[in-house]
Structure formats: C-alpha cells, structure tokens
Amino acid sequence: NCDKPFLVIESAKKEYRSLALADKAQSLKVYTLGRPEYNCPEINPFFVQQGISLQTHIDFLKDLFNASFSFYGPMPYILEKCLQNIYRKRGWNLTLGYHPYFLGLNKKRLGADTLDAADIRSRYACKASKYLFPTMEDLKGEVKRYIEQEMTYEGEVAGNIKSAMLARLESLCSGSKGYMFNTRGRLDMSTLLNERAVF
C-alpha cells in the first residue's frame, strides 16, 4: 500500500488496473482511454498550458498531426495556416503568443506587470477560460473553409485534398475519440501528477 502519488501509463497490458480492486480507500484513479463510460479523460489538444508559448504549442500540434496522419503535398502547410487561424479567431495574438484575457483586458500596453504569473494563473483557473481555446471541430471547420475559399488549387486536386484532410479530422471528432479530443475539457496535469493514477 503506497501513499505516495504515482502515474502508471500502461498502453497494452492491464495488470495495474487490478490495483483498483484491491484499493479499499478507492484513492487510485484509473483512466480508460476510448471508453467514456469508464473514466475517460477529456483532453483538448488545443489547450495551451500556462508558460508554454503559443507558437511552440502550434509547432507541437503540427508534429502530432503529421506523425498521426500521412499528410502529403500542401497538407502540412494548410494545417499550419488553419491552426494559426483558429487561435486568431479565438482572439489570440500570434505575435505575442497570448490571449488578451490572460494579460488583463484593460491593459493598453505590455509592461513588466502585464506578465504577472499569479494573475495569469488565476485567469487560467477560471472555468470560463476554456472557451478561449479552439476545439477539433473548429479545426475541421477551418480546414473546410480554407480549402474552399482561400486555396488556389481547383477541381479534382482541391477535392482530393479537402476529402483527405476532413476524413482524418472527422475521425477525431466523433465516437470515443471525439469524446476525448473534441472537447473543451482539459486534464489538469498538476492534479494528475499528485494523485495515484493508472492510464
């Protein structure tokens, strides 16, 4: 019996899950990916952790999508433009890497007091802040809009690119993957790392 926090990530085997049966205090949290009925986490991949620059986060998202799906031709470029657009539409400043809400809406200029970590942390903690971040559905809609209205490709080429990208994103917007990734929910990493948990 261990009172120390731990996190076990077991992707294939399920042996650690049996600890939950033996845990009388029920302090062990078991997360089950892809099974909403069994404590499936909601993870908005577009949520930017406090202290991470927006551009770095967008670069990580590009790498994640490129590793998960086989993008070809102009798809990586389209993805990058659409990622930037969905944050811009939510009010983010791509140059500074912040949303004005986190800096204080009434501040006219950036100064030393603008980047007060405690103030930003309290704004992140506000439940309404989750609406400042895009969702997978936002990305899917932006890809569709961008290809139809801004892309210079026409005819069959544009149709093939649109179909390929939307099919890939649709798979992340529906079913159990949609429950996990097409959400405004966010997994609180500080809580997760301070509890006894099995993924």
Q: Which residue stretches match the model-derived regions?
A:
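P-loop NTPase motor domains
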Residues: 1-199
